Amino acid sequence: MQIIHTIRELRAWRKNAGKVAFVPTMGNLHEGHLALVREAKKRADSVVVSIFVNRLQFGQGEDFDKYPRTLQQDADKLAAEGIAVVFAPDEKELYPNVEQRYNVEPPNLQNELCGKFRPGHFRGVATVVSKLFHIVSPDIACFGKKDYQQLAVIKGFVEDLNFDVEIVPVDTGRAEDGLALSSRNQYLSAAERDEAPRLYRELKAVAESLVQGSLDYAGLEKRAVQSLTEYGWVVDYVEIRRADTLEVARAGDKKLVVLAAACLGTTRLIDNLEIKLP
């Protein structure tokens, strides 16, 4: 396995790499990331995993400085998976100008759901992913469904800007108690970790009501927020949306997703659950 740090070297490798699948990450890899890697391996001759903590997608007061940088441990995990290349550029390599002068601006979705609470986050995501697509030139890119809004943003700009890459969504990896796997789970105290699976349980309760025929979307959202709040969560949102577009769900929609973001202590957790109605 190669660890490549420069764009020039990565592009030189790419010329003879055949069909390439790509998994972009910020490192600190866990089983959820490795599930993406394994899916990527099924679909291509070679897999590239990028490791880059992208400053542009962190807002003021967020955890950019304390986000774990664990390149050697990550490389060991990826070597064990048989990955061809780890692309680990530094900030100057990916952003040679002091300021990124041109950005990818996702319309609509940028200011909804998580975008309301993390201004500029999805601009940062879309910009860095588009840069990485230009550098790696993958045939396929795998993204986890845990970051459902991020996945929708990436699908949107790939379609609208004619990127020649197939986006492969991969189901959310979960711990045995249902908690979605996330690098930020390590910030949780022992007591918070015990409480954290409640977020997924509330999503399942909403989904069950929808499957049983409830059309009181606002009521279901409100009850989930109230339940989480009673147990000490600070809730950003619980919302039911159309799964394909993330537009507000309407009666008669068959493919839905319920999404949530909430803070437990100082740790912000997100999760979602897709629902197909009969």
From Swiss-Prot:
Residues that bind ATP: 26-33, 144-147, 173, 181-184
Binding site for beta-alanine: Q57
Location relative to the cell: Cytoplasm
The keyword Cytoplasm appears for this protein: yes
Superkingdom, taxonomy of origin: Bacteria
Organism lineage: Bacteria, Pseudomonadati, Pseudomonadota, Betaproteobacteria, Neisseriales
Name this polypeptide is given: Pantothenate synthetase
UniProt-listed Enzyme Commission number(s): 6.3.2.1
Organism expressing this protein natively: Neisseria meningitidis serogroup B (strain ATCC BAA-335 / MC58)
